[in-house]
C-alpha cells in the first residue's frame, strides 16, 4: 500500500477558528472524531497571520498550534496507515474573506483534496449604521466604536468579581447597541454584492488548484440579539448557494441539520452567534457525515 499524505483546509473567521484560549471549534472536534474512526493518523494545524512587530528579535508574521495525533506508532503512523490526514485551520477572528487570499500560496503548496469555506457571518451580521458611516453619537465611548466592540460577550469569567464587572459593562453595551439599531436601520460590515464578488474570486482560485471546495451556509442567530440579521442571513445563504453552483463548488446547508441536534441556546454561547463546545461537536458530526459518507474513499476506513 502506497503512503500518501492528505490535506484538508478550512477558511473562515472566529466561528471556524474557535472561541476562548483553547479555540475549540468544529475543526478541532472533527479531528477528534475522525481519529476514532481512522486507521491513519489525523493531525490538526492551526495557523493565523499576525503583526510582524509582535516579536522584537525575530521577524514572524504567522503564529500557530500543532495538534499531532497521539496514537502514532514509532513516529511512522498508525498500523495499517496509508497516509496521514492533516486538517489545516487557517481561520482568524476579526478577519474578513479578503484575508483568505493571502493563504493561496500555502494552499497551493499543500495541494489539498478538500477546502471548506465558512464565510459571510462576520461580514453579514447587522450592526449599527454608525460603524460604516462614522456617525457615532457623542455619548458612545471611543472604545465601543470598533466593529465588534459592542457585540454581546460569549461568556463571563468564573471569578465573581470579574463576572460582575463584565456583566455590568456588557449590559450597558447591549442597551446602547440595541438603541442605535432601533434609531437607525443597521448595516452589515460588508454589502452582500461585495461579499459574493470576493467569494466568487476565491472559489475560482481554489478550483484551479484542483481541490474539492465546499461552502457551508451561515448558521442561525437570534433576532433578539442581532435584530435584522436572521432575515439578512437567509438572503446571504441564497446568494452563497448561487455562487457555489456557478463556480463549480458545493453548497452545504448544515444549519438545517444542526436544529435537529438540540436547542439553539444549548449549542451556542450566550451571544447566539458563536457555537459552544456542544455546538462544535454537533457541527463536526454533521460535517463528518457530509464529507466522509464512505471513510474508505479517503483512505481512512
Language-model features: locations:
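Serine-esterase "nucleophile elbow" of acetyl-processing enzymes
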Residues: 1-91, 101-116
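Alpha-helical cap/lid subdomain in secreted, periplasmic
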Residues: 3, 74-86, 95-277, 281-301
Amino acid at each position: 500500500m502506497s503512503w500518501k499524505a492528505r490535506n484538508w483546509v478550512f477558511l473562515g473567521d472566529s466561528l471556524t477558528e474557535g472561541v476562548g484560549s483553547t479555540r475549540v471549534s468544529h475543526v478541532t472536534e472533527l479531528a477528534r472524531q475522525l481519529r476514532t474512526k481512522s486507521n491513519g493518523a489525523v493531525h490538526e494545524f492551526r495557523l493565523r497571520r499576525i503583526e510582524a512587530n509582535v516579536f522584537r528579535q525575530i521577524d514572524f508574521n504567522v503564529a500557530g498550534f500543532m495538534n499531532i495525533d497521539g496514537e502514532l506508532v514509532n513516529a511512522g503512523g498508525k498500523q495499517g496507515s496509508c497516509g496521514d490526514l492533516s486538517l489545516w485551520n487557517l481561520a482568524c477572528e476579526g478577519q474578513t474573506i479578503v484575508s483568505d487570499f493571502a493563504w493561496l500560496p500555502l494552499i497551493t503548496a499543500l495541494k489539498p483534496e478538500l477546502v471548506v469555506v465558512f464565510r459571510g457571518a462576520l461580514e453579514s451580521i447587522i450592526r449599527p449604521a454608525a460603524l460604516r458611516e462614522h456617525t457615532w453619537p457623542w455619548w458612545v465611548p471611543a472604545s465601543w466604536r470598533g466593529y465588534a466592540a459592542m457585540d454581546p460577550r460569549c461568556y463571563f469569567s468564573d471569578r465573581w468579581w470579574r463576572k460582575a464587572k463584565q456583566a455590568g459593562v456588557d449590559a450597558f453595551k447591549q442597551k446602547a447597541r440595541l438603541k442605535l439599531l432601533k434609531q437607525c436601520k443597521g448595516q452589515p460590515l460588508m454589502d452582500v454584492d461585495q461579499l459574493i464578488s470576493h467569494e466568487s474570486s476565491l472559489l475560482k482560485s481554489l478550483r484551479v488548484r484542483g481541490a474539492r471546495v465546499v461552502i457551508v451556509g451561515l448558521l442561525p442567530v437570534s433576532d433578539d440579539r442581532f435584530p435584522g440579521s436572521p432575515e439578512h442571513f437567509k438572503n446571504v445563504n441564497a446568494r452563497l448557494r448561487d455562487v457555489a453552483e456557478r463556480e463549480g463548488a458545493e453548497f452545504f446547508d448544515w444549519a438545517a441539520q444542526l436544529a435537529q441536534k438540540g436547542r439553539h441556546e444549548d449549542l451556542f454561547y450566550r451571544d447566539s452567534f458563536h457555537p459552544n463546545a456542544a455546538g462544535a461537536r454537533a457541527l463536526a458530526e454533521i460535517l463528518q457525515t457530509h464529507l466522509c459518507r464512505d471513510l474508505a474513499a479517503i483512505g481512512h476506513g
